[in-house]
């Protein structure tokens, strides 16, 4: 399928690189509705920091155990912010926000790619960062069972480099093609003196749709259901503040070979985020899928419980899949504790599905047939939180 690039009166990609694509709208609409899959304190929040500790020039003791908070990102502070926002917008709580429209819900998600952009600037790899941008939002909205409809982007830079911007947009178009959604429009902002020369920032926004009778909200999950993990391509788009500190400690360059791997460190770290849309929607259509967790910031520890009803937790079997070489290198070089790894990175599993035992048997049989790769990574149990065996 070719990605559709649609035009509108306020923004059109026929004038793709026009700087003055700014839009402002004020609308009055019904109060949005959001299905809260769990307590709002479990809501994913991205917290970005540009502190000195986030930079590669920072020196630390090689014997210290690195962690995300010391790298400038405080997940707990993000959770506190969500609690405060929830007082003003009590409907939040899921991976995507739901808005009622007739017999369906529109499902919306927005995200960026974090400090992975810093590595894009260092490696010069710009043509896949747009795939990351699309993936972060569409992977969120499919957790409700929604089919992506359209995507919008925000590209901000100090001085517009048309060739560079073209590479970025090319990746966004490819991400939309993989997601089978339309690239509806976007905003290009040229902001002199705000960004360093040659640098830019990205944000994306995706909207999908799902029938009210088909929405996946986790309410039917019970103890004994099975967790199926879908493999990631690497770090995806979370945890790069910590990754960059590990890289600084290692004394390796992005052009050096990944220890234990088959590519350079730069290529391994910049591998685009997997877009799970087609695979997940196909599995949903076959039945038995009760919940979905996009494994982003917060890792397994924070994201999996978000789909459970109260009183349920999960047991993860860490030997169910092999930890990819990239994560082994990150943990060993940074002397990072297991608990920190599990709350920061996806560890090779980018999406977790909660399915009935019958659906699990079908999925694993399809894996044997070579249709795709998936792992039985755990089970739902009575209790709270996530334990590891």
Curated annotation (Swiss-Prot):
The keyword Methyltransferase does not apply. It is an enzyme of class 6 (ligase). Pathway: Purine metabolism; IMP biosynthesis via de novo pathway; 5-amino-1-(5-phospho-D-ribosyl)imidazole from N(2)-formyl-N(1)-(5-phospho-D-ribosyl)glycinamide: step 2/2. It is found in: Plastid, Chloroplast. Its EC number is 6.3.3.1. It comes from the Eukaryota. Keywords: ATP-binding, Chloroplast, Ligase, Nucleotide-binding, Plastid, Purine biosynthesis, Transit peptide. Residues 46-65 are annotated as: Disordered. InterPro entries: PurM-like_C_dom (IPR010918), PurM-like_C_sf (IPR036676), PurM-like_N (IPR016188), PurM-like_N_sf (IPR036921), PurM_cligase (IPR004733). One of its GO terms (biological process) is 'de novo' IMP biosynthetic process. Residues 1-58 form a transit peptide. Transmembrane segments: none annotated. One of its GO terms (molecular function) is copper ion binding. It catalyses: 2-formamido-N(1)-(5-O-phospho-beta-D-ribosyl)acetamidine + ATP = 5-amino-1-(5-phospho-beta-D-ribosyl)imidazole + ADP + phosphate + H(+). One of its GO terms (cellular component) is mitochondrion. Belongs to the AIR synthase family. This is Phosphoribosylformylglycinamidine cyclo-ligase, chloroplastic. The gene is PUR5.
């Amino acid at each position: 399928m070719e990605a559709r690039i649609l035009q509108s009166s306020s923004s059109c990609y026929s004038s793709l690189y026009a700087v003055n694509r700014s839009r402002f709208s004020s609308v009055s609409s019904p109060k949005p509705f959001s299905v809260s899959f769990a307590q709002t304190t479990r809501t994913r929040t991205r917290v970005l920091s540009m502190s000195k500790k986030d930079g590669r020039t920072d020196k630390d003791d090689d014997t210290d155990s690195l962690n995300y908070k010391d790298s400038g990102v405080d997940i707990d502070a993000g959770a506190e912010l969500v609690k405060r926002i929830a007082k003003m917008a009590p409907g939040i709580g899921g991976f995507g926000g739901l808005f009622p429209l007739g017999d369906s819900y529109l499902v919306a998600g927005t995200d960026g790619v974090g400090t992975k952009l810093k590595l894009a600037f260092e490696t010069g790899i710009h043509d896949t960062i747009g795939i990351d941008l699309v993936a972060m939002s569409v992977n969120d909205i499919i957790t409700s069972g929604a089919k992506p409809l359209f995507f919008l982007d925000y590209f901000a830079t100090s001085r517009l480099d048309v060739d560079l911007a073209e590479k970025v947009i090319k990746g966004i178009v490819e991400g939309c093609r993989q997601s089978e959604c339309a690239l509806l429009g976007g905003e290009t902002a040229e902001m002199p003196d705000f960004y360093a020369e040659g640098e830019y920032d990205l944000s994306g926004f995706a909207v999908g749709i799902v029938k009210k009778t088909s929405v996946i909200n986790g309410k039917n999950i019970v103890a004994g259901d099975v967790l199926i993990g879908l493999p990631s391509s690497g770090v995806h788009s979370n945890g790069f503040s910590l990754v960059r500190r590990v890289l600084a400690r290692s004394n390796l360059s992005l052009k050096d070979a990944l220890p234990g791997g088959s590519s350079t460190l730069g290529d391994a770290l910049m591998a685009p985020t997997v877009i799970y849309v087609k695979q997940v929607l196909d599995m949903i259509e076959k039945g038995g899928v009760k919940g979905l967790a996009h494994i982003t910031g917060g890792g397994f520890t924070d994201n999996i419980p978000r789909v459970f009803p109260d009183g349920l937790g999960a047991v993860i079997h860490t030997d169910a899949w092999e930890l990819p070489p990239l994560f082994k290198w990150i943990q060993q070089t940074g002397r990072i504790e297991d608990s920190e790894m599990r709350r920061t990175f996806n560890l090779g599993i980018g999406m977790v599905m909660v399915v009935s035992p019958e659906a699990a048997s079908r999925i694993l049989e399809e894996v044997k047939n070579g249709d795709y790769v998936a792992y039985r990574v755990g089970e739902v149990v009575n209790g709270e939180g996530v334990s590891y065996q």
